[in-house]
Amino acid sequence: MGGRLPKPRKGMGTNLSVPNPLGFFPDHQLDPAFGANSNNPDWDFNPIKDHWPQANQVGVGAFGPGFTPPHGGVLGWSPQAQGTLTTVPAVPPPASTNRQSGRQPTPISPPLRDSHPQAMQWNSTKFHQTLQDPRVRGLYFPAGGSSSGTVNPAPNIASHISSISSRIGDPAPTMENITSGFLGPLLVLQAGFFLLTRILTIPQSLDSWWTSLNFLGEAPVCLGQNSQSPTSNHSPTSCPPICPGYRWMCLRRFIIFLFILLLCLIFLLVLLDCQGMLPVCPLIPGSTTTSTGPCRTCTTPAQGNSMFPSCCCTKPTDGNCTCIPIPSSWAFAKYLWEWASVRFSWLSLLVPFVQWFVGLSPTVWLSVIWMMWYWGPSLYNILSPFIPLLPIFFCLWVYI
């Protein structure tokens, strides 16, 4: 009967030394830290083991409610980790040293009459009474305003107001003024950078359009390749410096730059002529001599004192002058038309056609718009490289 005690069952949830309500803690005999070996296989039935009476006490532990590890858990060997909850009352520091460190209390603000005496001596009532003074009203309402009369303010009133202004100072700049002062130049800089990047793409786009005319229906390939300087297949608009077609690419882009400059100058000339800033004397039929200087004896008085001459004087052989007024706008265009009409007489036959075209019915204009819509995509492919020039023309039109 005094034989060996029966061996308990193995497995999860069979630890008899501690309450294990959750059932997922292994037996102690599986852990070598508790001394399980061949001589002492059953640690739970060892008569000389510590029964750990603290394990039966349910308290706050490290592994959840209902279980307290007797030998300390992952939180250490402190009383709180062992399941013993101890509360140590916090002793406040002495009153003498309570405010020696840290932020000091904010003192009570002094009365307004002590901290800002100028605000007490210059209140709203006194301010309005001063404004009712005719001498002060004359300072704010000059002659012709709502004031009954304009009187120079007395020196004492002016000095008093200036002293108040010097004490108060200028108003602080608001965030709105600061923001508007910064946003304007930034927007101009951003728009200028965008236009610059778009303008730099104009020569390459025109170069691609120019070279595509030589390869209708085919992919453009550089024609400068040969056996002496072999290069890989590339577009004629991006030739490397070692390619014989590089010099032709530079020549094309130089011509394109000159063409763009010519377009800008033509637009500027048209704009100045439209605003009447080109006082060009028109050609007088049957006469080839014109003079913009003032005439002494004219059939029409000449106005030679203005910035631009308002009439042109012709001096025929009889000594009398004939003055013809300069058009207020499109003077240069009319001069070119008259000059071309004298050189090419057939241009005068186009005048009735132009007048008829201007007086067309809306149906004809709708037909023209429909044709432009039909040919629009192809025209867009042709005119798309010139689209970045439109903002430049618009700026010239607005600011000149």
From Swiss-Prot:
Residues of the region (Pre-S1) are 2-119
Where does lipidation (N-myristoyl glycine) occur on this chain?
2
What does the entry list under GO cellular component?
Answer: membrane; viral envelope; virion membrane
Where does the sequence pass through the membrane?
182-202, 254-274, 349-369, 376-398
Q: How is it modified after translation?
A: Isoform M is N-terminally acetylated by host at a ratio of 90%, and N-glycosylated by host at the pre-S2 region.
What are the entry keywords?
Acetylation, Caveolin-mediated endocytosis of virus by host, Fusion of virus membrane with host endosomal membrane, Fusion of virus membrane with host membrane, Glycoprotein, Host-virus interaction, Lipoprotein, Membrane, Myristate, Transmembrane, Transmembrane helix, Viral attachment to host cell, Viral envelope protein, Viral penetration into host cytoplasm, Virion, Virus endocytosis by host, Virus entry into host cell
Cellular localization per UniProt: Virion membrane
Q: What is known of its domains?
A: The large envelope protein is synthesized with the pre-S region at the cytosolic side of the endoplasmic reticulum and, hence will be within the virion after budding. Therefore the pre-S region is not N-glycosylated. Later a post-translational translocation of N-terminal pre-S and TM1 domains occur in about 50% of proteins at the virion surface. These molecules change their topology by an unknown mechanism, resulting in exposure of pre-S region at virion surface.
State the protein's name.
Large envelope protein
What species is given as this protein's source?
A: Hepatitis B virus genotype A3 (isolate Cameroon/CMR711/1994) (HBV-A)
